[in-house]
């Protein structure tokens, strides 16, 4: 029997799957080695660039029922880190495409995509935040 709060536990994987599918359709032609992941470390011996790491950051319950059993609203934040060995513009282009997909699902960006260089790698980071109610549809 699924928990009445299962929708909360499924948010990370559901939003990841939607963003991954939509972005791959838009980016795979330009970036054939594009890799989306939820894992911070790859088992692969060779890196694939650009890589898009998507993870939830502390989903916060905002509205429970009077008995405290059911979660009615959750503030959900996804952090996205795009890593590439090519250029700042490549990192930002991929991150901006991901950001647009979150915006299409009514997320707010805080921060919007920004890029930094560390050694030979460029990273672009963004966070997307949105409240979800138990009966919201994506």
Describe each PLM feature range.
Residues 93-138:
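Acidic-leaning, charged glycine-interspersed low-complexity segments
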Residues 64-72, 117-119:
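Short, solvent-exposed beta-strand/turn "edge" segments of beta-rich domains on protein surfaces
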Residues 86-87, 94:
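Long, charged/polar, surface-exposed segments that mediate recognition or autoinhibition
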Residues 63, 87-89, 133-137:
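Intrinsically disordered, low-complexity acidic/polar segments
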Residues 1-66, 89:
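Small/polar-rich, solvent-exposed N-terminal microdomains that initiate assembly or binding
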Residues 26, 35, 53, 73-77, ...:
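Ser/Thr- (and often Asn-) enriched beta-sheet segments in non-cytosolic proteins
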Residues 56-59, 71-77, 97-101:
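Short, low-complexity, polar/charged sequence segments that are solvent-exposed and flexible
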Residues 70-86, 122-134:
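Oligomerization/assembly interface segments of phage tail-like spikes and tubes
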């Amino acid at each position: 029997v699924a928990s009445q709060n299962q929708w909360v536990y499924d948010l990370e994987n559901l939003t990841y799957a939607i963003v991954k599918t939509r972005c791959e359709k838009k980016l795979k032609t330009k970036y054939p080695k594009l890799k989306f992941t939820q894992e911070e470390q790859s088992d692969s011996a060779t890196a694939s660039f650009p890589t898009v790491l998507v993870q939830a950051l502390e989903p916060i319950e905002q509205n429970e029922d009077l008995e405290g059993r059911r979660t009615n609203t959750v503030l959900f934040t996804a952090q996205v880190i795009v890593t590439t060995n090519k250029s700042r513009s490549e990192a930002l282009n991929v991150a901006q495409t991901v950001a647009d997909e979150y915006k299409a699902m009514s997320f707010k960006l805080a921060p919007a995509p920004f890029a930094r260089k560390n050694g030979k790698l460029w990273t672009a980071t963004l966070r997307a935040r949105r409240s979800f109610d138990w009966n919201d549809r994506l």
